Amino acid sequence: MLLVRTTSLNVSRMPVPCLARGIGILKGKYRLANLMNAQPSVRHVSSEIQQKDQQAGESNTATDTGVIHKSDEETLIYFDNVYARATSVWNPTLWYNLLLRNQSRDAVREKIRNLASPPNNPIYGLELKSTIPVKRDGGVFATFVVPPKYTKAQVNSLIQQNTARESSKNLLSYFTRVSAFPVKGSPWIEDLRRLPSTTIVIKFQGPALTEEEIYSLFRRYGTIIDIFPPTAANNNVAKVRYRSFRGAISAKNCVSGIEIHNTVLHIQYENIIRGHLVSNFFTNHTRIAIPVLFALLSIFAVLVFDPIREFSIEQKITHKYSLSWDNKFWKQLKTLTSSTMTSIKYYWGGPDDNHQRKHLWEERIEKVNDLKMWLEENNNTFVVIRGPRGSGKHDLVMQHTLQNRANVLYLDCDKLIKSRTDPKFLKNAASQLGYFPIFPWIDSVTGVLDLTVQGLTGQKTGLSETKESQFRNMLTTSLMSIRRIALKNYKAFVSTGDGTVNVKEEDYLQQHPEAKPVIVIDRFEGKSEINGFVYKELSDWAAMLVQMNIAHVIFLTETVASNQRLSESLPNQVFKNLILSDASKENSRNYVLSQLEDYLYYNKKSKGENVKEPESEKEIAENNDSDSEADTSVKEAEVILNEKELQEIDASLEPLGGRMLDLQAFVRRVKSGEEPSEALDKMIEQASEQITQMFLSDKIDSNKSAQAWELIELLSANPVIPFREIVNKPLFKAAPETGIMELENNGLITVSRDRGVLQEIRPAKPLYRAAFTYLINDPELAKVLKTRYLLKVVGFETGRIKKWEEELKPLGKVPDQKLFKTRLDYLSGKINASNAVITKCEEEIKNLSK
């Protein structure tokens, strides 16, 4: 009727613009009428493809072909918001919802059935034939068989009403509400990686629709923000932007494939090219972005790895979860077992081995008690134990003082100092501190990155660290772990009879010195050419531990040079010093005889000799004798040995002195079957080889080797050499203190000091004096070493003469020689003295070569 009425207008009377506008209105209204009467079209798939599928016996389901097949008696409804919509290619929300909801096929069908035909308002005869999930879009296509009493339009309307009513009953209906839309087009069921978007792209296969037509067709699915009609460049593509994803998804699935006035609409999601904020930031702001990235990585590494490292350091100190004997449980079990076995041995009269460890230490029991008392004191504990190499500092502390201590951390500076490469140093430091995990290879990577970034941006990232800073970070992390161990049982509030008392951390640590860990730093020398920073870092770290009163610190050192380094770290702290020296002759003899008691008895017994049975521990206790346990063992050994054997042992012990490591080596050799004199000779020979390799070989600097040989000659004749005698020696004149201290640090000699001034020079250990004599008495070796020493002296004196001759040359050209007569006489005397030394050395070399 509308079309008939519009054709009766008097078109001839209209102006041209009005005529054009009128024609446009008529055309738009005519197309709107066609739009209202639009019928769903059929998405055409090549019949040849369908025939091929049928011939092959393959299925033609929507999942396999992308096309939904239905009859005229069926209606197709799209339900949205049934699944979680895919937000990315990986779709993590789908996996999350699988844990919270039952999304099986039967559960989804039951849900669709209850929404479309609920029990309180059913559609009688409605049958759910099939469901096709579109999980990427979060919806489901459902095919229903229309009951005979209803038309398709009535069924669609009832399903929409029931779905809206049923899905709004939930308290969270704003988020879980489901909408149902009849499918007007022919949807394409695809699972391509085309993520849903709020903008849909409409491709017109035929004349394009106007904005009014597009709005009328797509508005029912959601609020439209904007419509982008076809342009002159692309006249068959339009875009519709929705406010929500649900509107765009429903429009795409319900309208795609519809045919309106010979125009088929194909709808897809707009392919969003997302400008990534982070990538754009890195691309456009490189100088800022790269340092920020590395800073974030560093913060992340600290947050993740530092707690693990603190835990591993605590484990290193406490051995709480360790299966070694340092574990507290194993220590208690070992103590219980040892005490039980000791009681059984005592009851049966068996020997007890515990006394054998004490004889050498009888003269040091007082020092052990002092050290234990210092660890139990409430004031800050900073102990320095000094003694020559091999004097038993380590055993005194670790075996006799801290054997039953729970929390002990032992650090060996020698392993750190001797690390030649940075990765090796970091591994050794981490191993001793328990610092795990550590990645030494990162240093090389960060170094390359730092250079690369510096080339790109002109500035360093600061990501690469030196080994000094990394070692300092290890110590800082260790400090936090030590503090946590010390305050493990600390409680801020303590309940008493009068109420609650607030206890400070300082007061708790002052009252419980046993809770503080003990840090033992061994071989602390104070100076080193390689990795010398270790001493400063350790001393500063130890000073901080003592100042915070969270640990006891014990330094083991061989020289007094370390005191200067420690004084710099703790200038106002008074150190507790413990000086260890060699055992006396009597105690050395008692130790060796007590250790050899059982061996001598069973050795003579096996040879068939008649020897007195040693008394058991039980018999010794029952005798109630005034003699000590050590004296008893020594007397038994003296009874077993004859006078000649005792004299042989005494003669062998004379060169060994009281150095504990040498005494232990001597005992092991005798127990292995060597005679005392034979054991001593082999030890002297071994010491001489060690001296030759370290100080007298061809690989050693000739000047140092000559200085060492001169001291060897002097110390073989005299046990002690005053330092003043060395000052005038030719090879020591230039820098006597430097040469002597270098030989001391290398372990050839030891020097006593008086208020820092060098006084007396001795061999590094008593056995070395016998080794010096052995080297001097070896004719072939002594001849080679003596010749090398004399040649060095000749070269030294020759160099001095050349220097004086250079000074004489300009003086000889002066006309009046009387002006410089005094200087000429001085230089002449010097040259004559050096010539005399050279003549004497050459004469000795000549005699040695005969």
Swiss-Prot record:
Which named protein is this? Mitochondrial escape protein 2
Question: Where located?
Answer: Mitochondrion inner membrane
Where is composition skewed (Polar residues) in this entry? 47-64
Q: Where is the composition biased (Basic and acidic residues)?
A: 607-621
Q: How is this protein situated with respect to the membrane?
A: Single-pass membrane protein
A GO term for molecular function: RNA binding
Per the record, what ranges lie on the membrane's Mitochondrial matrix side? 45-287
Q: What is its main location?
A: mitochondrion
